[in-house]
Amino acid sequence: MESQQLSQHSPISHGSACASVTSKEVHTNQDPLDVSASKTEECEKASTKANSQQTTTPASSAVPENPHHASPQTAQSHSPQNGPYPQQCMMTQNQANPSGWSFYGHPSMIPYTPYQMSPMYFPPGPQSQFPQYPSSVGTPLSTPSPESGNTFTDSSSADSDMTSTKKYVRPPPMLTSPNDFPNWVKTYIKFLQNSNLGGIIPTVNGKPVRQITDDELTFLYNTFQIFAPSQFLPTWVKDILSVDYTDIMKILSKSIEKMQSDTQEANDIVTLANLQYNGSTPADAFETKVTNIIDRLNNNGIHINNKVACQLIMRGLSGEYKFLRYTRHRHLNMTVAELFLDIHAIYEEQQGSRNSKPNYRRNPSDEKNDSRSYTNTTKPKVIARNPQKTNNSKSKTARAHNVSTSNNSPSTDNDSISKSTTEPIQLNNKHDLHLGQKLTESTVNHTNHSDDELPGHLLLDSGASRTLIRSAHHIHSASSNPDINVVDAQKRNIPINAIGDLQFHFQDNTKTSIKVLHTPNIAYDLLSLNELAAVDITACFTKNVLERSDGTVLAPIVKYGDFYWVSKKYLLPSNISVPTINNVHTSESTRKYPYPFIHRMLAHANAQTIRYSLKNNTITYFNESDVDWSSAIDYQCPDCLIGKSTKHRHIKGSRLKYQNSYEPFQYLHTDIFGPVHNLPKSAPSYFISFTDETTKFRWVYPLHDRREDSILDVFTTILAFIKNQFQASVLVIQMDRGSEYTNRTLHKFLEKNGITPCYTTTADSRAHGVAERLNRTLLDDCRTQLQCSGLPNHLWFSAIEFSTIVRNSLASPKSKKSARQHAGLAGLDISTLLPFGQPVIVNDHNPNSKIHPRGIPGYALHPSRNSYGYIIYLPSLKKTVDTTNYVILQGKESRLDQFNYDALTFDEDLNRLTASYHSFIASNEIQESNDLNIESDHDFQSDIELHPEQPRNVLSKAVSPTDSTPPSTHTEDSKRVSKTNIRAPREVDPNISESNILPSKKRSSTPQISNIESTGSGGMHKLNVPLLAPMSQSNTHESSHASKSKDFRHSDSYSENETNHTNVPISSTGGTNNKTVPQISDQETEKRIIHRSPSIDASPPENNSSHNIVPIKTPTTVSEQNTEESIIADLPLPDLPPESPTEFPDPFKELPPINSHQTNSSLGGIGDSNAYTTINSKKRSLEDNETEIKVSRDTWNTKNMRSLEPPRSKKRIHLIAAVKAVKSIKPIRTTLRYDEAITYNKDIKEKEKYIEAYHKEVNQLLKMNTWDTDKYYDRKEIDPKRVINSMFIFNKKRDGTHKARFVARGDIQHPDTYDTGMQSNTVHHYALMTSLSLALDNNYYITQLDISSAYLYADIKEELYIRPPPHLGMNDKLIRLKKSHYGLKQSGANWYETIKSYLIKQCGMEEVRGWSCVFKNSQVTICLFVDDMILFSKDLNANKKIITTLKKQYDTKIINLGESDNEIQYDILGLEIKYQRGKYMKLGMENSLTEKIPKLNVPLNPKGRKLSAPGQPGLYIDQDELEIDEDEYKEKVHEMQKLIGLASYVGYKFRFDLLYYINTLAQHILFPSRQVLDMTYELIQFMWDTRDKQLIWHKNKPTEPDNKLVAISDASYGNQPYYKSQIGNIFLLNGKVIGGKSTKASLTCTSTTEAEIHAVSEAIPLLNNLSHLVQELNKKPIIKGLLTDSRSTISIIKSTNEEKFRNRFFGTKAMRLRDEVSGNNLYVYYIETKKNIADVMTKPLPIKTFKLLTNKWIH
């Protein structure tokens, strides 16, 4: 194509003219300016080709052809642009000194302003061109530029006007970051070289080849400014330009120096990592090379220590030097100089005897590894193409998708980068097997794949989950299995033909089989390491063998290339052919339907639904196996994508993980909603919400505007609230970038308070999901509440407030707790809540006239935030009020009735829930509400901080009876009177709990009467009567007299005039009489009830005599009364407030019944129906109605409640839930092995202490003549049954000393080597506590001894052998034991018999019958626990005499003689005891818990609020199935073992108040759900908070003539499915708690009485045994007592009637109890439930009750 002449461009403002350019023609279909990424390589090739063909032409003869124009252009036309770069950035052909460069002609024309401030240069436009100069011969880079090969016609061409240059030059990229500057400089230098300016670039010495001209300096300056913006330059570059902004050359020089320095460091590191030395070069030269590299790196700031340097050097040693790896591998502190001394020694020895073998000892494994056999005679080249990491025990293997099937032969160009620490077997070609074997030995006669990298071998793959093979000749029991889907790493399907077994016959003559899949679509046969591990085979890449767990070598591993291989010669061939398998697969697959076809046929349902339907036969004709599911995973249906398109969902877990580390109320989310339009000015238009990240507790505040001051006021309020109420400080607040949050006022406020604002990205609402979702939820609730209630829209924020209160109290499905529970607050008291918009009548305390109505209709909105009242909207006044003076308007149609739920109303429900809050409050008539619970196991059971401490201002007002009143409550003769709404107390009415919210519409007024077997522990019938049983009309009059009889003590002292009652009309049970009942206050009621004693054997009311209530039988003699008072006098029972006896008025006996069905309300769902109901007595109007509160879930009518579900009883789990594939859990190991304590212990000081303990143990074993040192036995000569493995274990004792113990592996000891009938006994903890208690009461001295190496004093009868200690180095020898070595099954029993015999024969002691390891004589008592002895004696010399006798035979050490009269501290079997003789004894574990609990990795909260109780009542353990993987399950079970193990140890030692929680959680160790773990953490947190608590004993009164042994019993009745009752007992000796027990009942109890009988039956045997022990140790008379709060149990024990024993289990137990009580002089007495300290053993209690029952004996 001919050249075309282009016109000059229009001049620029400086009047420069455009120079004419020349070039060879450019192909028309290629744009020379196109430098996009897709054409970069093509442009470079074209540039190189053009340069090679370039010739010089006259300036006037040729111009470059522009492919975008077909004809010559006018002067105004411009050259085309390419992407973001203007045309001047693309270097075109130019003259050496162009005439059009007058603007850049002289440096003086460059603006001299600071570069970083305002360069003010004139960037060249399309009219100006950059100069291009011939490249010089030298370049600053180590390698020439790929485009620097430009040549010129001759040297004289430089003098001509035109210069031969490149046709076009690609510009450098724009600099976008200071960190990218080093890489950008490289591209910029390349750009200069391609622009023929290579000569001006500084060389290695910092000087350019030639001087730069002014035009070149201008070009350099402008291009640098264009492509390197000042804001992206590094600091050091800006510093240079600040001095001289044109000094670009200095920047280039500095950059080249940095690149050279970095290159040198990289080269040194690579050289050091790839050191190779075999003695071929002098050792001096090798040492000099290595030390120079290390010194150079250290000087450059890269520190190489001796350990790393030695490892790198030893890794490169080969030949005769290779053994240095093994001889010095244990020397941890070896230096480089020491290593080179060994290298020099070997090198000199080689030089001295070059042709002889070296005389130093070589490692046998080295000789084996160095022997090679090559099939060719040429010298092989060892190539390690895949570098292995140092000290990596598991070598890298390849995945199937990484293996290429082409060009698999090793390349000679690959560099040897590094080798593993133990050099693996490497093959250099297919014939080099490296094991001395021929090729024919490792190949298989069957089909081989000739293109394999290593034929006849299987590739070991650690990433493959299945084994795959291409040949069918090794597949056994093959069958088609189309359901298996196999994908590679790119998620591509691998078709599977068949599945079968792959059988190995290893070199130890064992056969092993694994599953294998057949497919021809893989490059190599893959052997999965995971499937090998499943059959107990592991790959050891340090030895390069396959081995079993016991160390048996099965086959060698070959390393070839990058991968590891195993020979196929170990595979057993089969008779199956490839066509057989392929035909089977083909015949199966031909009948399959493609999944897209089925998907379309079944209405585009998803694959999971279709597959599940086919599996369950909901679709017939074809089965699941008839569908080809291979494409179901990746199949994307275009129609589904269009038709089912949805918005992007919120990303789960998108919040940053560090937020989880914040404590409660430290990280808040906030957002503002609004505005809401068309509202009155008084109504808020916005609200601002806050959510705590940890607890998810929410706050909302109304706003009228979004001004800075308004937002600041809210922030000030909530920060102060959190600080004062929760003692927390807010650290971070996350919010969006709205102006209300980004203003300067709020920013300064947050900065002043030390709060970090965390802003989300603009317009990214998903990043603010917590606050956004809360606003959406609250608005949904708001719309629903307004729609349901029909209230006006301006009350919208009240609906938001109501929703917030409720939402904070609802449990989250994820955390299983509510926000209030997370925040440590009590649950929401539903009795204080009304439906939103409930019609009420509000009392007008200030009417306009005395004759005006006092009631104003209103609608309840939400509980008040600032008082105990309610926020109520008054439409007539158009305002809201905060008041407690309201009553629910019944029978009034509300908005709820518009839905016509079969005309259902909720009046009775509201009465029952809010009976005590419906009333008007008259002036000065406010009374405190105190719920009572008399003679019940259920004291305060539901009072879980639900009641505030302040009194409630509540009274009731009369309303008209509703249509829902049961007709059975009226007869034709009855009068139309109003009824009193008596609210059922929370403590006894389970139907007010979460398990039953709403009652049945139909009610029955007939009381339910049951037999005595189903009564509560207080002896009351299950009539659920508050105080007394209901009486028939016939004996009503007689009951009046009974109320004034001896049923109530001191009845005459309390007159009716002192009560100030308000008479309330009530209806009798029969509905025929209406009587007036004086209204009684709560305190007065309690005073009257407390002394009332109903009869234990009382029959049902219809069979009663005239006196309906009969007191319990009292002692008939003064001595028995004294015994009862004596037993109870010294017990640490809680102090109750003094109460005055009270007489009940006659009409009060006719209160209607309250039907109570007790539910479980404990940690694990344990409940207790052993409770009386109580009455909340309030002042009421004379016109109040009486409404029976009786709820039965069985009578729920679903037709009457279409929109509300019936209440469901929540299931509680008290059984261990099934977990799939659960294997046995190994016990937790608390000791260290030899390698952990010594070999690899990095703590030098601790290691030295363990070494010292090791030698001490060995010396002690030799001293004690533990084994026969005269003869060592060969292992092969001894029966394996009699050989016991041995090991060293190390641990750190409580006193800080380090201990080593050489033990035998008794856990694998054969049963024939010991007598299974022998037992190892230790002192029972009850015996120790009894001895300590008697020691305190009798001023005994307590001496603590320790016998060193106790077991070694006992001889062994059996013939047993063990392995010698490792330091002897006799691995193949055995030694015969002579002593009872530690760890043997019989050692404990042998020692017990030895020390028992010595104490009896030599010390004159005798063992207490029934109490092993408790010895006594006339002066001394000894408690023996293995090698620990505790001596008790009134005379210290008696203890010293025993010590002297013991030292004659045993190495006895006195730990504490106990001779001081001041306080003495002991550490006895883990108990930290403080004992001052004759005064007190304190038992605790503060120091031990302070040390151990932090090591449990429990998230303790030392700075937060301390827990006041170990658990919360009302929490239930969910029964949902636990689905977690095996590793996580084992990890959590091990964690539970540690936590519950420590808690059990502490609980059974002295913290008996924790036993219930420990026992409940111990039942769930194998069910470690999140909820169980949280409860366990809470228990450990409570132990941490109360670690300083102690069991306090005080000396008994010296005047007491008898020892008093008492058992206090209690039980909680488990009346739910999957649940049993809980029983508990506490034992006291002379008023001191010595033991406790809490456990699940072994038998299913059908009533509370049975549970109580079970508890008593468990206590009596231990009580009798303790009685015998006390009598043996102290000769005083003993009084035995048993206390229970179940009157029915006492009645059964004392009664002679046997007719009511209906089942054989508890009937037998009851009869046995009668015999034991009568035959053992056991006193059984009743104790009030409020004083029953055993209550803590059977149920979780509220904080107040828990403290009341425990603060007397543990504090």
UniProtKB/Swiss-Prot annotation:
PROSITE patterns reported for this sequence: ASP_PROTEASE (PS00141), INTEGRASE (PS50994)
Alphabetized CDD domains for the sequence: RNase_HI_RT_Ty1 (cd09272)
Location(s), subcellular: Cytoplasm; Nucleus
Stretches the record annotates as RNA-binding: 299-401
Function summary: Capsid protein (CA) is the structural component of the virus-like particle (VLP), forming the shell that encapsulates the retrotransposons dimeric RNA genome. The particles are assembled from trimer-clustered units and there are holes in the capsid shells that allow for the diffusion of macromolecules. CA also has nucleocapsid-like chaperone activity, promoting primer tRNA(i)-Met annealing to the multipartite primer-binding site (PBS), dimerization of Ty1 RNA and initiation of reverse transcription.
Molecular functions (GO terms): aspartic-type endopeptidase activity; ATP binding; DNA binding; DNA-directed DNA polymerase activity; RNA binding; RNA-directed DNA polymerase activity; RNA-DNA hybrid ribonuclease activity; zinc ion binding
Name of the protein this chain belongs to: Transposon Ty1-PR1 Gag-Pol polyprotein
EC number(s) per entry: 3.4.23.-, 2.7.7.49, 2.7.7.7, 3.1.26.4
Entry keyword Nucleotidyltransferase: yes
Domain Integrase catalytic: 660-835
GO BP, one annotated term: DNA recombination
Active site: D461
Basic and acidic residues bias (residue ranges): 1038-1053
Name of the coding gene: TY1B-PR1
Cellular component GO terms held in the UniProt record: cytoplasm; nucleus
Catalytic reactions of this protein: DNA(n) + a 2'-deoxyribonucleoside 5'-triphosphate = DNA(n+1) + diphosphate; Endonucleolytic cleavage to 5'-phosphomonoester
Main localization category: cytoplasm
